[in-house]
Swiss-Prot record:
Alpha C-terminal domain (alpha-CTD) as annotated region, ranges: 252-328
CDD domains, alphabetized: RNAP_alpha_NTD
EC number(s) per entry: 2.7.7.6
Name listed for the protein in its UniProt record: DNA-directed RNA polymerase subunit alpha
One of the GO biological process terms: DNA-templated transcription
Gene of this entry: rpoA
Phylogenetic lineage: Bacteria, Pseudomonadati, Chlorobiota, Chlorobiia, Chlorobiales
Length: 328
């Protein structure tokens, strides 16, 4: 075990606001600075590294470039492309696929008209408007759909194997619509300089917020593991140093559990501490000197005696012993 740091007891979920596409997750307590450190890492991974499904390109009969217009269709090709970028999919398929649509007017072409030929995917925002086709028009369109991560520009979706008239589209694969990070102060015992990390995660519905958080955490863990398993030239020295830190930590924990009655104190001091319900060294060092002086029959002579007793043990009044306290 490496030197103990304050770790969050668990991740809390705000059940009042939780839905299939939104979740508020709260981690506390964290050491000062770790709210931003962990929160930024989670936010970046959530927004850029989770897999998703998106349209990679289209081919429309009679259209040979992306700046064309289509007879009988109100929207031009650039506007249709912009609308298709917004289509959100739910898919467990790991390969790319193509679906062909033949649309005859009059018709309002909606995202829900994009149907998988073999059930490879499902459109989530079915009511999204794509184009308006008048009564005299008919349009045949091939839609290419792929899996990926984050954002991929149209240039990277072009390849030599595509048919003539293929129009590449920017692919927004990420299933995450928004991530908001908030870091607040929180208290542990008497110490107030710990942090609470709050992550508001909004997805497109293709993945639950819970699964998104879990997947992002695993991605970070997989990367950090390489550093945790790193073996430097001075590995033996590092291990010995960590071992020494662990021993010091355990020794301090045991020392703080020492009963007051086991200390060589005067009867007066023993009685004062007993009346104040101070039973262990942990209880004693967590008090300030001015607090002790407020107890009945507790004077400066007793305070001096206790101060000297603590100094012999390498302790003092007003210590923060949160990290040494047993959990549970």
């Amino acid at each position: 075990m490496i030197y103990q740091m304050q770790m969050p007891a668990k991740i809390d979920v705000d059940e009042a606001t939780h839905t299939g596409s939104f979740g508020r997750f709260i981690a506390q307590p964290l050491e000062r600075g770790y709210g931003v450190t962990l929160g930024n890492a989670m936010r970046r991974v959530l927004l850029a590294s989770l897999p998703g499904t998106a349209i990679t390109g289209i081919k429309i009969d009679g259209v040979f470039h992306e700046f064309s217009t289509i007879d009988g269709v109100r929207e031009d090709v650039p506007e249709i492309v912009l609308n298709l970028k917004k289509v959100r999919f739910k898919s467990n398929c790991k390969r790319s696929c193509k679906t062909t649509l033949t649309l005859a007017g009059p018709k309002d072409f909606l995202a829900g008209d994009i149907v998988a030929q073999e059930g490879e995917f499902e459109v989530l925002n079915k009511d999204l408007h794509i184009a308006t086709i008048n009564s005299e028009a008919a349009v045949t369109i091939d839609i290419y759909i792929g899996r990926g991560r984050g954002y991929v520009p149209a240039e990277e979706n072009r390849s030599d194997g595509m048919p003539i008239g293929f129009i590449a589209i920017d692919s927004i694969y990420t299933p995450i619509k928004n991530v908001k990070l908030t870091v607040e102060n929180t208290r542990v015992g008497q110490k107030t300089d710990y942090e609470k990390m709050i992550l508001d995660v909004e997805t497109d519905g293709s993945i639950s917020p819970d699964d998104a958080i879990s997947l992002a955490g695993r991605i970070i863990n997989d990367h950090v593991t390489f550093f945790a398993n790193f073996s430097p030239t001075e590995e033996e020295y590092a291990e010995e140093e960590y071992k020494q830190l662990d021993e010091e930590f355990e020794n301090m924990r045991k020392k703080l559990q020492t009963k007051i009655e086991d200390l060589d104190l005067s009867v007066r001091s023993h009685n004062c501490l007993r009346l104040a319900e101070i039973d262990t060294l942990a209880d004693l060092v967590s008090r300030r000197e001015d607090e002790l002086l407020n107890y009945k029959n507790f004077g400066k002579k007793s305070l001096t005696e206790l101060r000297e007793a603590l100094e012999k043990e390498g302790l003092k009044f007003g210590m923060d012993i949160t990290r040494y306290q047993m959990k549970g």
